A protein has these predicted regions:
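Solvent-exposed coil/turn segments that connect beta secondary-structure elements
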Residues: 29, 55-57, 120
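Structured domain cores in non-transmembrane regions
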Residues: 43-116
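Low-complexity, acidic Ser/Thr/Pro/Gly-rich terminal tails and inter-domain linkers that flank the onset
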Residues: 17-28, 44
């Protein structure tokens, strides 16, 4: 019986596959808002796509990247401040867009990609300032190989995805 109990934890650890994970954090800033994507999993993310979708956010959020268009007052174009070299291409964002897709070439365990951009709400509140709770309901989708998972931003302005099995 004792030897069976000693072997059980070993069998459990052998049977659980390593999983990829992603955490996305939104930080309101003036004049630039910031998104930080961190590989929170146990393996590298390779050839992955991340879709940041603000269309279902509580405040109807949009990207404000030009002086004229859908945004309000201050605008800020998309600017990568960390990890741009982890992308296979830099995405294009138009004023008023509510989606942004990132094509990740490789993001190692613990590494981050961060970018700044202006985010405005469209529901007539304080449009140039987005509170943490206003991004709640927005989604992220992670596609890697045949796996596709999604996560939703909570009132804490964080969305997380876990559970994509690591590939070799």
């Amino acid at each position: 019986m004792k030897s069976s109990l000693l072997v059980l934890p070993l069998l459990i650890s052998m049977s659980s596959a390593a999983a990829a994970g992603l955490s996305v954090r939104f930080d309101e800033g003036a004049p630039k808002d910031r998104f930080t994507l961190t590989n929170s999993g146990e393996c590298n993310l390779k050839q992955a796509r991340v879709m940041l979708d603000l269309s279902s956010s509580k405040a109807g959020l949009i990207f404000d990247v030009t002086a004229s268009g859908a945004g309000v007052e201050v605008f800020q174009p998309l600017e990568f401040v960390k990890g741009a070299d982890k992308l296979s291409r830099i995405p294009q964002v138009r004023d008023g867009d509510n989606r942004l897709e990132l094509s990740i070439a490789q993001l190692k365990k613990g590494e981050s990609i961060a970018f700044t951009i202006d985010v405005d709400d469209t529901l007539g509140g304080q449009e140039i300032i987005v509170s943490d709770s206003e991004i709640s309901g927005a989604n992220i989708q992670l596609s890697a190989g045949s796996n596709k998972l999604s996560g939703t931003f909570g009132a804490n302005a964080v969305a997380s995805i876990d559970g994509i099995e690591c590939s070799n």
